[in-house]
Amino acid sequence: MAFVSLDELEAVEPVPGYVATFVHTKQMTLANWKITAGSSFPEHSHPNEQIMMVLEGEFELTVAGESELVRPGVVAVIPADAKHSGRAVTDCIAIDVFYPVREDYR
């Protein structure tokens, strides 16, 4: 699996307003998100490290009580077990990378 076309993957909506395609390797998960403006996800944590990058739009992300507007050119690094939440300020396209793999997204 050296190359994957995201257009050929089945899209799922694990949270209302968050439509994703996922690519899983043995060790990592990549999530390609299309997020509707105003959609939010509640504060939560997981044992996976996470890196988030917004390709289009603006996303308000809170990590361990610190909030930042994530937009193109800004990368968010979320440590394992850190509490975080977020809200799409505008329609967004974003990428998340998780290590280790997110088994709950398989």
Identify the role of each PLM range.
Residues M1-Q27, A31:
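A short, N-terminal "cap"/entry segment at the start of jelly-roll beta-barrel domains
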